[in-house]
Design a protein with these regions (language model features):
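Active-site nucleotide/adenylate-binding loops and adjacent lid/helix of ATP-dependent enzymes
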Residues: 2, 79-84, 92-191, 254, ...
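Extreme N-terminal starter segment of soluble prokaryotic enzymes
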Residues: 4-10
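Short hydrophobic segments within beta-strands
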Residues: 10-12, 196
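Conserved N-proximal alpha/beta basic substrate-recognition cap immediately N-terminal to
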Residues: 14-117
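Short glycine-rich anion-binding loops that position phosphate/pyrophosphate groups of nucleotides
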Residues: 59-62, 143-144, 292
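Protein kinase-like catalytic core scaffold
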Residues: 137, 189, 201-202, 272, ...
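Phosphate-binding site of ATP-dependent enzymes
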Residues: 151-263
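C-terminal active-site "lid" helix and adjoining low-complexity regulatory extension at the edge
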Residues: 250-251, 264-271, 278-323
């Protein structure tokens, strides 16, 4: 794809349903942009899009939707854009960080922000001799996304049995994380903060009802709970669960906001969604850092604005700075 010299913006994406509200706003504003669909794409050394700004909205969970080639292609594309000196929002370093839950844990540890104790492994038998192994625990993929392939386990034998029966759990990168189980009230839920730059866009409380797919996009979790989401990821723990609920969180604790800003700044993220939960014993535990932020319009409207308009404002500000 050879872009017009007049092109301002290229949006890299894999799931158009998530990005359509932003595309609608960009169209309304007349911004000269192109959509770069990562599901079926090709580039050569000299034909990358020539735009002043690139906005990476690739998702680590693409493999869950059967799109195993999206992430490797995106990494190659972002690396080439970096070498060419392109201006990329959430570029190669940020995307690589989002792909690695163990790197996120390391960052939280560096910042002295409470996080789940975690062990990364490529063979269940490597866990047997560890003195820091404890159960119950959560099994998660190193490359996560959309709450995919998460399981609560009560013993190492249960882990062995699960992996023997479901070898696909090793996908996509053959690495898994065994993480401290954090009790919390699913009827109270978790908190997600959305950031543009280092500034808070909004915070919301997500009542999980025991579900793991907490994707805020209305394409995944519709406002009308009777509708089925387009990107539902069923799991054994979710069969009888009620739909996820999303609420504006107007009383975000100052310390939680401070920690969120620390993470965004330290990881050099342009756009971010950061999640934490509170345990019965008073811990505030940060456990998930997202660069592909799927915004929820009704939450923004509860704060008095359209969040996709704010993203467009952010992109236009960035365009001004790279003239």
């Amino acid at each position: 794809m050879v872009a017009s010299p007049a092109l301002d913006l290229v949006v890299l994406f894999e799931n158009e349903a998530w990005q359509q509200p932003l595309f609608d706003v960009l169209d309304q504003r007349g911004i000269a942009y192109e959509k770069y669909d990562l599901k079926s794409a090709a580039f050569g050394g000299h034909d990358l899009p020539k735009a002043r700004l690139y906005f990476n909205q690739a998702s680590p969970s693409a493999y869950v939707r059967g799109r195993l080639r999206v992430v490797p292609f995106t990494l190659a594309l972002l690396k080439n854009l970096q070498i060419q000196g392109a201006e990329v929002l959430n570029g190669i370093d940020v995307f690589s960080f989002e792909l690695s839950k163990s790197a996120q844990i390391a960052k939280l540890n560096e910042l002295e922000i409470d996080h789940p104790r975690s062990i990364i492994f490529n063979d269940a038998e490597a866990l047997a001799g560890r003195n820091d192994l404890s159960f119950p625990a959560m099994l998660k993929p190193e490359q996560g996304g959309s709450g995919a392939r998460m399981n609560q386990l009560d013993s190492l034998d249960e882990l062995r049995e699960l992996l023997a029966k479901n070898p696909n759990l090793w996908e996509p990168d053959q690495l898994l994380l065994l993480q401290e189980y954090l009790p919390h009230d699913p009827e109270v839920g978790i908190v997600r903060m959305e950031f543009l730059g280092e500034e808070l866009l909004y915070a919301m409380r997500i009542v999980t009802h025991g579900r793991f797919n907490l994707c805020p996009s209305e394409a995944c979790n519709p406002v009308e709970a009777v509708k089925e989401g387009a990107c539902a990821i069923p799991g054994p723990q979710e069969i009888d669960a009620r739909p996820v609920e999303f609420y504006p969180y107007l009383d975000l604790p100052a310390e939680a906001l401070k920690a969120g800003k620390q993470i965004v700044k330290s990881a050099k993220m342009d756009v971010a969604g950061i999640e934490y939960l509170e345990t019965p014993d008073g811990r505030r535990v940060f456990y998930d850092i997202n660069a592909n932020s799927n915004l929820r319009k009704p939450i923004g409207e509860a704060f008095g604005f359209d969040p996709f308009e704010r993203v467009a404002d952010f992109l236009e500000q960035k365009l001004q700075s790279v003239r």
